[in-house]
């Protein structure tokens, strides 16, 4: 099943802050999916049912095309099928709100930030939903004067893309310190595996058959026997040459011997609350992993570090402002675990399989600023825009070295519109 989001996404969150976890309300989306080779329209309504501090988020969806409805996702023919159908419609479970003594959201995580966000900022485990349905957890608790936060992006995987923990404590009346640790135990685990046979599609000649991944393994003894006869006429032939001549596929991937490619990050931050509407902070982040040295590909090197010596958050009427001065060493990118992390965690290109970490060499020493503004206008729409301008080094693939005087600019903007004429709809977002 493949999900292709449209530019228009209805988000009916009963909330004020852009990107904040949803409070009681209704969300929804429209789009298209491909099921068994057929394209269907998708209509999804996501209400939240509040029960005291508990919120149960549901995902009630329909697939249809010009030939009719797709009912396989609404199967009540047996007890087991009915149970699977009902469980499949639970989008998340929520207890309390961020800032409470105990808060958690389990299931879909639409937006999670750890600390001030130098490592994990606005992460979402729903970017490939419903093609990939992850069951994550964001837990926040206050215990004996300490703040504790936990992020787990997917309990359905032994190697989730985001596994993070943070501890914080107020050391002075308005000053708090925090320490965060984040890891991706194996970036390569993000490769798609459509049939769940532990052979990623990239290495699987039969990606939709859970019992077969190549021709050779399905009847290895037979092919080995024929190869012995083949060698009598071709004594210097290899097994691969024999299989290629007779177009017999053989995957060189082995789940038992597959190497893992982890990456981790450590962050420290200090936050000073000037008032209810303004906060100052400083944060430092360090990535730990192993990438090929672009200047000598026989060596491996560690990723780098980033520093925000001063940052500020402020609320001015309907406007929420954020500003940071950023400094980064080579091989560091701010907000490494961002909203799109699950999408670019690992990818396949002309050179083969590459990870997000492997591309860090493209970033040289950079200094600059980042600003963001969220503005609500007469409760009609909310505009959120972020801009980063960094200057310094950038890797030049043609010259095979870092060039100075280069810039790195990024811009992201979203708009949320309140369609008051639509019953029960509180917000619609366009990206």
Named regions from a protein language model:
Residues 1-4, 274:
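Positively charged n-region of N-terminal signal peptides that target proteins for export
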Residues 3-13:
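Sec-dependent N-terminal signal peptides
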Residues 15-46, 346:
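Short glycine/proline- and aromatic-enriched beta-strand/turn motifs that initiate or cap beta-hairpins
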Residues 19-23, 38, 68-70, 101-103, ...:
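Signature for the C-terminal beta-barrel architecture of outer-membrane proteins
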Residues 47-56, 97-101:
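Short, solvent-exposed loop/edge-beta patches enriched in aromatic
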Residues 56-92, 119, 292-293, 299-300:
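Surface-exposed loop and membrane-interface regions of Gram-negative outer-membrane beta-barrel proteins
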Residues 63, 109-110:
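Acidic, small-polar-rich N-terminal luminal/periplasmic segments of exported/outer-membrane proteins
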Residues 87-103:
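Gram-negative (and chloroplast) outer-membrane scaffold detector with strong preference
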């Amino acid at each position: 099943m493949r999900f292709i989001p449209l530019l228009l996404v209805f988000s009916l969150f009963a909330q004020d802050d852009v990107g904040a976890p949803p409070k009681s309300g209704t969300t929804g989306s429209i789009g298209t999916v491909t099921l068994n080779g057929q394209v269907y329209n998708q209509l999804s309504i996501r209400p939240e049912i509040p029960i005291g501090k508990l919120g149960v988020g549901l995902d009630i969806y329909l697939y249809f095309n010009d030939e009719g409805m797709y009912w396989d996702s609404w199967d009540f023919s047996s007890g087991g099928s009915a149970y699977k159908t009902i469980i499949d419609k639970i989008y998340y479970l929520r207890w309390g709100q961020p800032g409470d003594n105990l808060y958690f959201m389990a299931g879909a995580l639409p937006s999670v930030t750890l600390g001030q966000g130098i490592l994990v900022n606005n992460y979402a485990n729903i970017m490939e939903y419903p093609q990939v349905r992850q069951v994550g957890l964001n837990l926040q608790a206050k215990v004996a004067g300490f703040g504790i936060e936990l992020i787990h992006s997917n309990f359905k995987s032994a190697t989730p893309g985001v596994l993070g923990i943070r501890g914080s404590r107020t050391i002075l009346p308005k000053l708090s310190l925090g320490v965060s640790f984040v890891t991706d135990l194996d970036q390569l685990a993000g490769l798609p595996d459509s049939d769940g046979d532990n052979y990623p599609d990239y290495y699987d000649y039969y990606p939709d058959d859970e019992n077969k991944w190549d021709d050779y393994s399905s009847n290895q003894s037979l092919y080995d026997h024929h190869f012995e006869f083949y060698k009598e006429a071709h004594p210097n032939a290899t097994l691969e040459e024999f299989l290629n001549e007779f177009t017999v596929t053989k995957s060189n991937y082995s789940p038992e011997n597959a190497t893992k490619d982890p990456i981790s990050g450590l962050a420290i931050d200090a936050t000073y609350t000037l008032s209810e509407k303004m906060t100052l902070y400083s944060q430092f982040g360090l990535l730990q992993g192993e990438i090929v040295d672009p200047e000598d590909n026989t060596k491996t090197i560690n990723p780098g570090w980033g520093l925000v010596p001063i940052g500020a958050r402020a609320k001015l009427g309907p406007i929420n402002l954020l500003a940071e001065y950023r400094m980064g060493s080579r091989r560091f990118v701010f907000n490494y675990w961002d909203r799109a992390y699950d999408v670019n965690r690992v990818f396949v290109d002309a050179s083969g399989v590459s990870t997000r970490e492997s591309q860090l060499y493209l970033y040289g020493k950079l200094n600059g600023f980042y600003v963001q503004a969220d503005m609500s206008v007469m409760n009609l729409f909310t505009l959120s825009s972020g801009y980063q301008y960094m200057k310094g080094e950038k890797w030049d693939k043609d010259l095979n070295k870092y060039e100075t005087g280069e810039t790195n600019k990024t811009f992201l903007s979203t708009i949320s519109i309140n369609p008051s004429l639509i019953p029960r709809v509180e917000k619609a977002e366009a990206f």
